[in-house]
Amino acid sequence: MSDYLSVSHLTKYLKMKFDRDPYLERVYLTGQVSNFRKRPNHQYFSLKDENAVIQATMWASAYKRLAFDLEEGMKINVIGRVQIYEPSGSYSIIIEEAVPDGIGALAIQFEQLKKKLTNEGFFDDKHKQDLPQFVQKVGVITSPSGAVIRDIITTISRRFPGVEILLFPTKVQGEGAAEEIVANISKANQREDLDLLIVGRGGGSIEDLWAFNEEIVVHAIFASQLPIISSVGHETDVTLSDFVADRRAATPTAAAELATPVTKADIISWISERQNRSYQATLRLLHQKRDQVMVLGQSVIFRQPERLYDAYLQKIDRLHNSLLNSIKSKLSDSRQAEMTVSHRLQTMNLLSTINRYQERLMTLNQWLNVDMQKQFDQLRTRFEKAQDALLTLDTKRIVARGYSIVRQEDKIISSVKDVSTGDLLAIEMRDGQIEVEVKNGN
Protein backbone atom coordinates (compact mmCIF):
# COMPACT_ATOMS: atom_id res chain seq x y z
CA MET A 1 0.00 0.00 0.00
CA SER A 2 1.43 3.37 -1.00
CA ASP A 3 2.07 6.08 1.60
CA TYR A 4 0.27 9.36 1.06
CA LEU A 5 2.27 12.59 1.53
CA SER A 6 0.90 15.62 3.23
CA VAL A 7 0.82 18.91 1.41
CA SER A 8 3.46 20.23 3.79
CA HIS A 9 5.79 17.32 3.10
CA LEU A 10 5.41 17.74 -0.62
CA THR A 11 6.05 21.46 -0.38
CA LYS A 12 9.15 20.91 1.78
CA TYR A 13 10.43 18.36 -0.71
CA LEU A 14 9.97 20.73 -3.62
CA LYS A 15 11.62 23.59 -1.67
CA MET A 16 14.60 21.36 -0.95
CA LYS A 17 14.87 20.55 -4.65
CA PHE A 18 14.67 24.23 -5.55
CA ASP A 19 17.27 25.20 -2.97
CA ARG A 20 19.73 22.51 -4.08
CA ASP A 21 19.30 23.01 -7.80
CA PRO A 22 22.30 25.05 -9.09
CA TYR A 23 20.29 26.25 -12.09
CA LEU A 24 17.77 27.93 -9.81
CA GLU A 25 20.32 29.61 -7.51
CA ARG A 26 21.21 32.20 -10.17
CA VAL A 27 18.57 32.68 -12.83
CA TYR A 28 18.79 35.14 -15.75
CA LEU A 29 15.24 36.09 -16.63
CA THR A 30 13.51 38.46 -19.08
CA GLY A 31 9.99 39.63 -18.46
CA GLN A 32 7.51 42.50 -18.44
CA VAL A 33 6.76 44.27 -15.15
CA SER A 34 3.14 43.75 -14.05
CA ASN A 35 1.08 44.72 -10.98
CA PHE A 36 3.81 47.18 -9.91
CA ARG A 37 3.05 49.73 -7.20
CA LYS A 38 6.00 51.49 -5.62
CA ARG A 39 6.31 50.83 -1.88
CA PRO A 40 8.48 52.59 0.72
CA ASN A 41 10.90 49.67 1.17
CA HIS A 42 10.63 46.22 -0.46
CA GLN A 43 8.98 45.93 -3.88
CA TYR A 44 6.50 43.18 -4.85
CA PHE A 45 5.30 42.69 -8.44
CA SER A 46 5.05 40.14 -11.25
CA LEU A 47 7.11 39.31 -14.32
CA LYS A 48 5.24 37.91 -17.28
CA ASP A 49 5.48 37.01 -20.94
CA GLU A 50 2.84 35.87 -23.42
CA ASN A 51 2.25 32.51 -21.69
CA ALA A 52 3.28 32.65 -18.03
CA VAL A 53 3.60 34.78 -14.89
CA ILE A 54 6.02 34.60 -11.95
CA GLN A 55 5.89 36.56 -8.73
CA ALA A 56 8.93 38.77 -8.07
CA THR A 57 10.37 40.30 -4.92
CA MET A 58 13.09 42.94 -4.71
CA TRP A 59 14.45 43.81 -1.31
CA ALA A 60 15.01 47.49 -0.45
CA SER A 61 18.82 47.21 -0.68
CA ALA A 62 18.66 45.89 -4.24
CA TYR A 63 15.99 48.39 -5.28
CA LYS A 64 18.08 51.35 -4.12
CA ARG A 65 20.96 50.22 -6.35
CA LEU A 66 18.85 50.55 -9.52
CA ALA A 67 19.99 53.26 -11.95
CA PHE A 68 16.44 53.67 -13.24
CA ASP A 69 12.87 53.68 -11.93
CA LEU A 70 10.69 50.62 -12.34
CA GLU A 71 7.48 51.30 -14.22
CA GLU A 72 4.39 49.28 -15.06
CA GLY A 73 4.77 47.52 -18.44
CA MET A 74 8.57 47.98 -18.63
CA LYS A 75 10.51 45.03 -20.03
CA ILE A 76 13.54 44.23 -17.88
CA ASN A 77 16.36 41.71 -17.57
CA VAL A 78 16.87 40.42 -14.03
CA ILE A 79 19.28 38.20 -12.14
CA GLY A 80 17.98 36.38 -9.08
CA ARG A 81 17.20 33.09 -7.37
CA VAL A 82 13.98 31.05 -7.41
CA GLN A 83 12.40 29.97 -4.15
CA ILE A 84 9.18 28.39 -2.88
CA TYR A 85 7.06 30.09 -0.27
CA GLU A 86 5.85 27.19 1.87
CA PRO A 87 2.65 28.67 3.39
CA SER A 88 1.11 29.22 -0.04
CA GLY A 89 3.08 26.68 -2.00
CA SER A 90 3.86 29.34 -4.62
CA TYR A 91 7.21 29.99 -6.15
CA SER A 92 8.80 33.38 -6.93
CA ILE A 93 12.05 34.98 -7.95
CA ILE A 94 14.10 37.12 -5.56
CA ILE A 95 15.64 39.78 -7.83
CA GLU A 96 19.18 40.89 -7.00
CA GLU A 97 19.94 42.94 -10.14
CA ALA A 98 17.80 44.48 -12.88
CA VAL A 99 18.37 46.56 -16.03
CA PRO A 100 16.00 47.72 -18.79
CA ASP A 101 15.90 45.27 -21.67
CA GLY A 102 17.51 45.99 -25.04
CA ILE A 103 19.38 49.01 -26.46
CA GLY A 104 16.78 51.41 -25.03
CA ALA A 105 17.98 50.87 -21.46
CA LEU A 106 20.07 54.05 -21.35
CA ALA A 107 17.37 55.95 -23.19
CA ILE A 108 14.88 54.96 -20.49
CA GLN A 109 17.31 55.98 -17.79
CA PHE A 110 17.87 59.27 -19.62
CA GLU A 111 14.15 60.05 -19.82
CA GLN A 112 13.56 59.13 -16.19
CA LEU A 113 16.40 61.31 -14.92
CA LYS A 114 15.35 64.12 -17.23
CA LYS A 115 11.81 63.99 -15.82
CA LYS A 116 13.10 63.99 -12.25
CA LEU A 117 15.44 66.95 -12.77
CA THR A 118 12.76 68.86 -14.66
CA ASN A 119 10.35 68.46 -11.76
CA GLU A 120 13.06 69.70 -9.39
CA GLY A 121 13.48 72.88 -11.47
CA PHE A 122 17.03 72.33 -12.72
CA PHE A 123 16.13 73.24 -16.31
CA ASP A 124 13.99 76.34 -15.59
CA ASP A 125 14.91 79.40 -17.67
CA LYS A 126 14.82 81.60 -14.57
CA HIS A 127 18.09 80.00 -13.44
CA LYS A 128 19.92 80.73 -16.72
CA GLN A 129 22.74 83.26 -16.56
CA ASP A 130 23.35 85.81 -19.31
CA LEU A 131 26.54 85.37 -21.31
CA PRO A 132 28.96 88.33 -21.10
CA GLN A 133 29.15 90.53 -24.19
CA PHE A 134 32.92 90.97 -23.94
CA VAL A 135 35.28 88.31 -22.60
CA GLN A 136 38.98 88.38 -21.79
CA LYS A 137 39.52 84.78 -20.70
CA VAL A 138 37.50 81.64 -21.53
CA GLY A 139 37.82 78.30 -19.73
CA VAL A 140 37.36 75.07 -21.73
CA ILE A 141 36.64 71.71 -20.07
CA THR A 142 37.31 68.98 -22.63
CA SER A 143 39.88 66.46 -23.82
CA PRO A 144 43.26 68.04 -24.66
CA SER A 145 43.70 65.79 -27.71
CA GLY A 146 40.31 66.11 -29.42
CA ALA A 147 39.17 68.32 -32.26
CA VAL A 148 36.96 70.30 -29.88
CA ILE A 149 39.73 72.40 -28.36
CA ARG A 150 41.31 73.04 -31.79
CA ASP A 151 38.02 74.29 -33.25
CA ILE A 152 37.43 76.56 -30.24
CA ILE A 153 40.93 78.05 -30.38
CA THR A 154 40.69 78.64 -34.15
CA THR A 155 37.27 80.30 -33.98
CA ILE A 156 37.98 82.57 -31.00
CA SER A 157 41.36 83.64 -32.42
CA ARG A 158 39.68 84.55 -35.70
CA ARG A 159 36.75 86.42 -34.16
CA PHE A 160 38.56 88.26 -31.38
CA PRO A 161 42.36 87.96 -31.23
CA GLY A 162 43.65 88.55 -27.73
CA VAL A 163 41.03 86.53 -25.85
CA GLU A 164 42.86 84.01 -23.65
CA ILE A 165 41.80 80.35 -23.59
CA LEU A 166 42.49 78.23 -20.50
CA LEU A 167 42.16 74.46 -21.05
CA PHE A 168 41.20 72.15 -18.19
CA PRO A 169 42.32 68.72 -19.53
CA THR A 170 39.43 66.37 -18.77
CA LYS A 171 38.46 62.76 -19.35
CA VAL A 172 35.16 62.94 -21.25
CA GLN A 173 34.02 59.29 -21.40
CA GLY A 174 34.35 56.06 -19.50
CA GLU A 175 34.79 55.33 -15.82
CA GLY A 176 35.64 58.39 -13.72
CA ALA A 177 34.80 60.88 -16.48
CA ALA A 178 31.79 62.39 -14.69
CA GLU A 179 33.79 62.90 -11.48
CA GLU A 180 36.61 64.59 -13.42
CA ILE A 181 34.16 66.94 -15.19
CA VAL A 182 32.67 67.92 -11.82
CA ALA A 183 36.11 68.51 -10.29
CA ASN A 184 37.22 70.79 -13.14
CA ILE A 185 33.98 72.82 -13.05
CA SER A 186 34.64 73.40 -9.35
CA LYS A 187 38.29 74.29 -10.03
CA ALA A 188 37.30 76.80 -12.73
CA ASN A 189 34.83 78.50 -10.41
CA GLN A 190 37.60 79.11 -7.88
CA ARG A 191 39.44 81.35 -10.35
CA GLU A 192 38.69 85.06 -10.58
CA ASP A 193 40.10 85.65 -14.07
CA LEU A 194 37.59 83.61 -16.09
CA ASP A 195 34.52 85.12 -17.76
CA LEU A 196 32.75 81.89 -18.81
CA LEU A 197 33.19 78.14 -19.38
CA ILE A 198 32.73 75.88 -22.40
CA VAL A 199 32.06 72.25 -21.40
CA GLY A 200 31.99 69.70 -24.19
CA ARG A 201 33.33 66.89 -26.32
CA GLY A 202 32.96 65.48 -29.83
CA GLY A 203 30.28 63.13 -31.09
CA GLY A 204 29.75 59.50 -30.15
CA SER A 205 27.22 56.92 -29.04
CA ILE A 206 24.90 57.43 -26.10
CA GLU A 207 27.32 55.34 -24.03
CA ASP A 208 30.23 57.60 -25.05
CA LEU A 209 28.29 60.73 -24.10
CA TRP A 210 26.82 59.30 -20.91
CA ALA A 211 29.18 61.16 -18.54
CA PHE A 212 27.35 64.37 -19.50
CA ASN A 213 24.04 62.75 -18.45
CA GLU A 214 25.22 61.89 -14.96
CA GLU A 215 23.28 63.61 -12.19
CA ILE A 216 26.43 64.86 -10.45
CA VAL A 217 27.47 66.69 -13.64
CA VAL A 218 24.03 68.30 -13.94
CA HIS A 219 24.28 69.48 -10.32
CA ALA A 220 27.79 70.90 -10.89
CA ILE A 221 26.71 72.88 -13.97
CA PHE A 222 23.62 74.16 -12.16
CA ALA A 223 25.72 75.36 -9.18
CA SER A 224 28.38 77.08 -11.32
CA GLN A 225 28.79 80.81 -10.74
CA LEU A 226 30.43 81.11 -14.15
CA PRO A 227 28.10 81.04 -17.19
CA ILE A 228 28.46 77.70 -18.99
CA ILE A 229 28.05 76.85 -22.68
CA SER A 230 27.43 73.14 -23.31
CA SER A 231 28.76 71.64 -26.55
CA VAL A 232 28.43 67.87 -26.34
CA GLY A 233 28.37 65.65 -29.43
CA HIS A 234 26.87 66.61 -32.77
CA GLU A 235 23.80 68.71 -33.48
CA THR A 236 21.47 65.70 -33.14
CA ASP A 237 22.99 64.62 -29.82
CA VAL A 238 21.25 65.96 -26.72
CA THR A 239 22.45 65.48 -23.14
CA LEU A 240 21.15 66.58 -19.76
CA SER A 241 24.13 68.95 -19.60
CA ASP A 242 22.63 70.78 -22.58
CA PHE A 243 19.37 71.32 -20.70
CA VAL A 244 20.96 72.68 -17.51
CA ALA A 245 23.68 74.81 -19.14
CA ASP A 246 23.08 78.53 -19.66
CA ARG A 247 23.41 78.06 -23.44
CA ARG A 248 23.66 75.03 -25.69
CA ALA A 249 25.83 74.96 -28.83
CA ALA A 250 25.48 72.29 -31.50
CA THR A 251 29.20 72.34 -32.36
CA PRO A 252 32.46 73.57 -30.77
CA THR A 253 32.61 76.31 -33.42
CA ALA A 254 29.13 77.48 -32.45
CA ALA A 255 30.19 77.44 -28.78
CA ALA A 256 33.18 79.67 -29.57
CA GLU A 257 30.90 82.06 -31.47
CA LEU A 258 28.52 82.26 -28.49
CA ALA A 259 31.50 82.97 -26.23
CA THR A 260 32.53 85.92 -28.44
CA PRO A 261 29.24 87.50 -29.56
CA VAL A 262 31.03 90.74 -30.39
CA THR A 263 33.96 90.48 -32.79
CA LYS A 264 36.90 92.81 -33.26
CA ALA A 265 35.35 93.99 -36.54
CA ASP A 266 32.10 94.76 -34.71
CA ILE A 267 33.96 96.97 -32.22
CA ILE A 268 35.81 98.84 -34.97
CA SER A 269 32.52 99.43 -36.79
CA TRP A 270 30.85 100.56 -33.56
CA ILE A 271 33.65 103.04 -32.80
CA SER A 272 33.47 104.44 -36.34
CA GLU A 273 29.71 104.86 -36.06
CA ARG A 274 30.06 106.60 -32.69
CA GLN A 275 32.67 108.97 -34.08
CA ASN A 276 30.41 109.88 -36.98
CA ARG A 277 27.41 110.42 -34.68
CA SER A 278 29.54 112.60 -32.39
CA TYR A 279 30.74 114.66 -35.35
CA GLN A 280 27.19 115.18 -36.61
CA ALA A 281 25.99 116.16 -33.14
CA THR A 282 28.82 118.69 -32.77
CA LEU A 283 28.07 120.12 -36.20
CA ARG A 284 24.38 120.54 -35.33
CA LEU A 285 25.32 122.27 -32.08
CA LEU A 286 27.62 124.70 -33.88
CA HIS A 287 24.89 125.57 -36.38
CA GLN A 288 22.43 126.07 -33.55
CA LYS A 289 24.77 128.42 -31.67
CA ARG A 290 25.53 130.32 -34.86
CA ASP A 291 21.82 130.88 -35.44
CA GLN A 292 21.42 132.05 -31.85
CA VAL A 293 24.23 134.59 -32.29
CA MET A 294 22.63 135.89 -35.49
CA VAL A 295 19.28 136.29 -33.74
CA LEU A 296 20.89 138.15 -30.85
CA GLY A 297 22.72 140.42 -33.30
CA GLN A 298 19.37 141.51 -34.75
CA SER A 299 17.86 142.31 -31.33
CA VAL A 300 16.86 145.88 -30.38
CA ILE A 301 19.58 146.19 -27.75
CA PHE A 302 22.35 145.78 -30.29
CA ARG A 303 20.66 147.97 -32.93
CA GLN A 304 19.66 150.76 -30.46
CA PRO A 305 22.12 150.60 -27.53
CA GLU A 306 20.82 153.91 -26.13
CA ARG A 307 17.86 152.01 -24.82
CA LEU A 308 20.16 150.46 -22.26
CA TYR A 309 20.45 153.74 -20.31
CA ASP A 310 17.04 155.31 -21.00
CA ALA A 311 15.85 153.92 -17.71
CA TYR A 312 18.83 155.46 -15.89
CA LEU A 313 18.02 158.91 -17.33
CA GLN A 314 14.45 158.63 -16.12
CA LYS A 315 15.63 157.51 -12.70
CA ILE A 316 18.01 160.49 -12.42
CA ASP A 317 15.17 162.88 -13.28
CA ARG A 318 13.00 161.31 -10.62
CA LEU A 319 15.76 161.55 -8.01
CA HIS A 320 16.42 165.20 -8.92
CA ASN A 321 12.77 166.16 -8.61
CA SER A 322 12.46 164.21 -5.37
CA LEU A 323 15.46 166.03 -3.91
CA LEU A 324 14.08 169.46 -4.83
CA ASN A 325 10.66 168.65 -3.45
CA SER A 326 12.17 167.36 -0.22
CA ILE A 327 14.26 170.52 0.25
CA LYS A 328 11.27 172.74 -0.46
CA SER A 329 9.14 170.77 1.98
CA LYS A 330 11.73 170.98 4.74
CA LEU A 331 12.20 174.74 4.18
CA SER A 332 8.46 175.28 4.21
CA ASP A 333 8.11 173.30 7.44
CA SER A 334 10.95 175.28 9.02
CA ARG A 335 9.47 178.64 8.03
CA GLN A 336 6.08 177.60 9.34
CA ALA A 337 7.60 176.49 12.63
CA GLU A 338 9.58 179.70 12.91
CA MET A 339 6.50 181.82 12.22
CA THR A 340 4.56 179.87 14.83
CA VAL A 341 7.26 180.35 17.43
CA SER A 342 7.63 184.03 16.60
CA HIS A 343 3.91 184.53 16.89
CA ARG A 344 3.85 182.86 20.27
CA LEU A 345 6.81 184.92 21.47
CA GLN A 346 5.02 188.11 20.52
CA THR A 347 1.98 187.13 22.51
CA MET A 348 3.72 185.81 25.62
CA ASN A 349 5.42 188.07 28.19
CA LEU A 350 6.96 185.57 30.54
CA LEU A 351 10.70 185.27 30.21
CA SER A 352 10.72 181.62 31.04
CA THR A 353 8.28 180.89 28.28
CA ILE A 354 10.36 182.85 25.80
CA ASN A 355 13.51 180.98 26.80
CA ARG A 356 11.76 177.64 26.52
CA TYR A 357 10.52 178.40 23.04
CA GLN A 358 13.93 179.70 22.02
CA GLU A 359 15.51 176.40 23.13
CA ARG A 360 12.89 174.41 21.25
CA LEU A 361 13.49 176.57 18.20
CA MET A 362 17.22 175.94 18.33
CA THR A 363 16.69 172.21 18.74
CA LEU A 364 14.28 172.20 15.85
CA ASN A 365 16.74 174.11 13.65
CA GLN A 366 19.55 171.70 14.54
CA TRP A 367 17.38 168.65 13.81
CA LEU A 368 16.21 170.20 10.57
CA ASN A 369 19.75 171.01 9.43
CA VAL A 370 21.04 167.52 10.30
CA ASP A 371 18.12 165.77 8.64
CA MET A 372 18.27 167.92 5.53
CA GLN A 373 22.02 167.40 5.25
CA LYS A 374 21.62 163.60 5.65
CA GLN A 375 18.92 163.37 3.00
CA PHE A 376 20.81 165.72 0.74
CA ASP A 377 23.98 163.56 1.05
CA GLN A 378 22.03 160.38 0.30
CA LEU A 379 20.35 161.87 -2.73
CA ARG A 380 23.61 163.35 -3.96
CA THR A 381 25.36 159.95 -3.64
CA ARG A 382 22.60 158.20 -5.59
CA PHE A 383 22.63 161.03 -8.14
CA GLU A 384 26.42 160.74 -8.61
CA LYS A 385 26.25 156.95 -9.05
CA ALA A 386 23.52 157.26 -11.62
CA GLN A 387 25.39 160.10 -13.33
CA ASP A 388 28.59 157.99 -13.48
CA ALA A 389 26.68 155.10 -15.00
CA LEU A 390 25.09 157.44 -17.50
CA LEU A 391 28.43 158.97 -18.42
CA THR A 392 29.94 155.52 -18.93
CA LEU A 393 27.16 154.53 -21.25
CA ASP A 394 27.03 157.90 -22.94
CA THR A 395 30.71 157.88 -23.98
CA LYS A 396 29.92 155.48 -26.81
CA ARG A 397 27.31 157.89 -28.13
CA ILE A 398 29.86 160.73 -27.98
CA VAL A 399 32.43 158.69 -29.88
CA ALA A 400 29.81 157.59 -32.40
CA ARG A 401 29.14 161.27 -33.31
CA GLY A 402 32.78 161.77 -34.35
CA TYR A 403 34.34 162.88 -31.07
CA SER A 404 37.29 161.27 -29.35
CA ILE A 405 38.00 160.51 -25.70
CA VAL A 406 41.52 160.78 -24.32
CA ARG A 407 42.49 158.54 -21.40
CA GLN A 408 45.55 157.97 -19.33
CA GLU A 409 45.37 154.65 -17.48
CA ASP A 410 41.52 154.62 -17.67
CA LYS A 411 41.38 158.28 -16.42
CA ILE A 412 39.69 160.71 -18.82
CA ILE A 413 41.95 163.70 -19.71
CA SER A 414 39.91 166.91 -19.91
CA SER A 415 42.73 169.52 -19.82
CA VAL A 416 46.25 169.97 -21.20
CA LYS A 417 47.29 170.63 -17.65
CA ASP A 418 46.63 166.99 -16.83
CA VAL A 419 49.49 165.68 -19.01
CA SER A 420 53.24 166.11 -19.34
CA THR A 421 55.79 165.54 -22.05
CA GLY A 422 56.42 161.82 -22.57
CA ASP A 423 53.08 160.66 -21.14
CA LEU A 424 51.41 157.76 -22.95
CA LEU A 425 47.76 158.39 -23.80
CA ALA A 426 44.97 156.26 -25.31
CA ILE A 427 42.55 157.95 -27.72
CA GLU A 428 39.20 156.18 -28.15
CA MET A 429 37.50 156.74 -31.50
CA ARG A 430 34.35 155.43 -33.14
CA ASP A 431 36.03 152.42 -34.75
CA GLY A 432 38.84 151.65 -32.31
CA GLN A 433 41.62 152.99 -30.10
CA ILE A 434 45.11 154.38 -30.73
CA GLU A 435 48.00 155.06 -28.37
CA VAL A 436 50.05 158.28 -28.56
CA GLU A 437 52.95 159.93 -26.73
CA VAL A 438 52.88 163.59 -25.61
CA LYS A 439 55.69 165.52 -27.34
CA ASN A 440 55.06 168.99 -25.90
CA GLY A 441 53.32 169.16 -22.58
CA ASN A 442 53.54 170.95 -19.24
Curated annotation (Swiss-Prot):
Disulfide bonds: none annotated. GO terms for molecular function: exodeoxyribonuclease VII activity; nucleic acid binding. Its EC number is 3.1.11.6. GO terms for cellular component: cytoplasm; exodeoxyribonuclease VII complex. GO terms for biological process: DNA catabolic process. Belongs to the XseA family. Bidirectionally degrades single-stranded DNA into large acid-insoluble oligonucleotides, which are then degraded further into small acid-soluble oligonucleotides. This is Exodeoxyribonuclease 7 large subunit. The gene is xseA.
